[in-house]
């Protein structure tokens, strides 16, 4: 029996999204023992319980109030939402924030020798998918009638098996499609992982814990998207150098011993620093340029 006074978070039991979730919580300073393959894991340093379940169970657990929070792909969340609405339900939850991992897209894919001219050419075609409601919503907007073939796995084999003319499946790199003689022809939904919270009143102590967790998550994501930059630069070209680093806060400027014409610059940049940018910095007279990762960050 779960202790309802503790914050309950549902996340995927295994897979890439699970690994990303565990890394996020770890970087937030939450210590969880995941050595044993238990369905429930307990945080050692915070009143938090982790429910490790199938990804398609997570939206329902949040919407039904079984857990307080869930980390889930937007594609799975949207499919469950549309499914419940189709059954006349009014599912309640709210999204706390989109996360910076779990990126994928739900796409239509056809055989390499199939001519695709747009959604209209799918009229009355058989389409295999694990996301029938998202697919229907998309094709309804296009005015296309189709025959759905529901598969819960191995969707990419449907055309070769004669089950469908086209498939609608998740795509990350496209390697699986290529291996099965398919090509991506239309993206219908783009997804990332997100953090959702159940609807309804939350006890004050739980809400305070959620607020603390959100602050830490924001800090982790911001740190991953930022770099700490140090360099030596000519004093007369500081404005030009700062212009090359959009998203950077105003830098810290320190004098260099024995050289009044140059300074040391330290700054946090929220932009990716490409080699081209570093070459431009060097052309402006910057030297000893260091770009360092940031582990934690709090504004």
From Swiss-Prot:
EC number: 2.4.2.17
Entry keyword annotation includes Cytoplasm: yes
Family classification: Belongs to the ATP phosphoribosyltransferase family. Long subfamily.
Pathway named in the protein's UniProt entry: Amino-acid biosynthesis; L-histidine biosynthesis; L-histidine from 5-phospho-alpha-D-ribose 1-diphosphate: step 1/9
A Gene Ontology cellular-component term: cytoplasm
Compartment list: Cytoplasm
UniProt lineage: Bacteria, Pseudomonadati, Pseudomonadota, Gammaproteobacteria, Enterobacterales
Protein's job: Catalyzes the condensation of ATP and 5-phosphoribose 1-diphosphate to form N'-(5'-phosphoribosyl)-ATP (PR-ATP). Has a crucial role in the pathway because the rate of histidine biosynthesis seems to be controlled primarily by regulation of HisG enzymatic activity.
Activity regulation as described: Feedback inhibited by histidine.
GO BP, one annotated term: L-histidine biosynthetic process
Cofactor: Mg(2+)
Gene Ontology MF annotations: ATP binding; ATP phosphoribosyltransferase activity; magnesium ion binding
Coiled coil ranges: none
Subunit (UniProt): Equilibrium between an active dimeric form, an inactive hexameric form and higher aggregates. Interconversion between the various forms is largely reversible and is influenced by the natural substrates and inhibitors of the enzyme.
Chief location of this protein within or outside the cell: cytoplasm
PANTHER family cross-referenced by the UniProt entry: ATP PHOSPHORIBOSYLTRANSFERASE, ATP PHOSPHORIBOSYLTRANSFERASE ATP-PRTASE
Keywords: Amino-acid biosynthesis, ATP-binding, Cytoplasm, Glycosyltransferase, Histidine biosynthesis, Magnesium, Metal-binding, Nucleotide-binding, Transferase
Organism of this sequence: Yersinia enterocolitica serotype O:8 / biotype 1B (strain NCTC 13174 / 8081)
Protein name listed in UniProt: ATP phosphoribosyltransferase
Catalytic activity of the protein: 1-(5-phospho-beta-D-ribosyl)-ATP + diphosphate = 5-phospho-alpha-D-ribose 1-diphosphate + ATP
């Amino acid at each position: 029996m779960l202790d309802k006074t503790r914050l309950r978070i549902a996340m995927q039991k295994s897979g890439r999204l699970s690994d990303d979730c565990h890394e996020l919580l770890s970087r937030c300073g939450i210590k969880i023992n995941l050595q044993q393959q238990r369905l429930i894991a307990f945080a050692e340093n915070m009143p938090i319980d982790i429910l490790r379940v199938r990804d398609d169970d997570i939206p329902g657990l949040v919407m039904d109030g079984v857990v307080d929070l869930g980390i889930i792909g937007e594609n799975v969340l949207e499919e469950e939402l549309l499914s419940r609405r189709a059954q006349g339900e009014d599912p309640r939850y709210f999204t706390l924030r989109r996360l910076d991992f779990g990126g994928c897209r739900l796409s239509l894919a056809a055989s390499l020798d199939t001519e695709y001219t747009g959604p209209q050419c799918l009229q009355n075609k058989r389409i295999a998918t694990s996301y029938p409601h998202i697919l229907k919503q998309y094709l309804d907007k296009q005015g296309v009638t189709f025959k759905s073939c529901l598969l819960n796995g191995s969707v990419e084999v449907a055309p070769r098996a004669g089950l469908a003319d086209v498939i609608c499946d998740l795509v990350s790199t496209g390697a699986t499609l290529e291996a099965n003689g398919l090509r991506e022809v239309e993206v219908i939904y783009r997804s990332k992982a997100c953090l959702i919270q159940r609807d309804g009143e939350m006890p004050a102590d739980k809400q305070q814990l959620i607020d603390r967790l959100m602050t830490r998550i924001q800090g982790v994501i911001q740190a991953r998207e930022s770099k700490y930059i140090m360099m030596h630069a000519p004093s007369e070209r500081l404005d030009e150098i700062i212009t090359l680093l959009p998203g950077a806060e105003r830098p810290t400027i320190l004098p260099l011993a024995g050289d009044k014409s140059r300074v040391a610059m330290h700054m946090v940049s929220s932009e990716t620093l490409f080699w081209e940018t570093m070459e431009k910095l060097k052309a402006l007279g910057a030297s000893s340029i260091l770009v360092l990762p940031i582990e934690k960050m709090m504004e």
